């Protein structure tokens, strides 16, 4: 062939590739938008649920002796990083509405650290149960909130030294977290993992 017939031959596939590539880009943008919307919706629902549980069970959700049922949601990061935002936001709002500014700061910090480490341990299972991922909320809250209560809200009737008050409060908070996270939270994860409908709600991208 002559050079004259080669030029249109080269131009043809280029012209065909443009609409195909554009269609692929448009589809990718739509998929990413849907993915983002789902994540935002999950964050909003989890945050709202956390606040509602704390407000509805307020006598048990605050103080040195507490079983904050909403803390079971701290196990949700095993299903995805987006749940970290939802749980932390919920904790922040719940503390803002029902506790002091000190608890807003340190309580939210404890929940943030706990959720991040829980996410890192999301694939660890003990006999099929998410027991190991449930431990970070217990430990972080026991240490941080235990110290917070001992330092910022000391018992005026107690003559115990500060270090003992920290340990005592830490144990009290830790027991509550064990009930909320290692019992209720692990149960929540197991129910979601074994239920097809719930898996679609919590895990579908």
Identify the meaning behind each predicted range:
Residues 77-87, 123-130:
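Membrane-helix interface "capping/anchor" motifs
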Residues 1-30:
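Short, Lys/Arg-enriched N-terminal segments with co-localized hydrophobic residues
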Residues 40-44, 82, 86, 103, ...:
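Small-residue packing motifs within transmembrane alpha-helices
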């Amino acid at each position: 062939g002559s050079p004259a017939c080669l030029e249109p031959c080269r131009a043809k596939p280029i012209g065909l590739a443009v609409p195909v590539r554009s269609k692929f880009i448009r589809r990718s943008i739509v998929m990413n938008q849907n993915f983002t919307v789902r994540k935002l919706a999950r964050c909003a629902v989890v945050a709202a649920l956390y606040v509602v549980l704390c407000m509805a069970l307020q006598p048990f959700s605050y103080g040195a002796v507490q079983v904050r049922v909403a803390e079971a949601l701290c196990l949700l990061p095993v299903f995805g990083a987006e749940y970290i935002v939802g749980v932390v936001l919920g904790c922040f709002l719940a503390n803002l509405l029902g506790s002091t500014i000190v608890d807003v700061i340190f309580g939210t910090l404890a929940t943030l650290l706990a959720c991040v480490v829980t996410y890192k341990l999301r694939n660890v299972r003990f006999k099929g149960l998410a027991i190991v991922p449930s431990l970070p909320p217990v430990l972080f809250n026991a240490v941080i909130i235990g110290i917070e209560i001992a330092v910022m809200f000391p018992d005026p009737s107690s003559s115990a030294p500060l270090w003992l008050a920290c340990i005592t409060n830490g144990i009290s908070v830790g027991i509550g977290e064990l009930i909320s996270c290692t019992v209720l939270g692990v149960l929540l994860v197991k129910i979601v993992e074994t239920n097809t409908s719930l898996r679609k709600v919590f895990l579908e991208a």
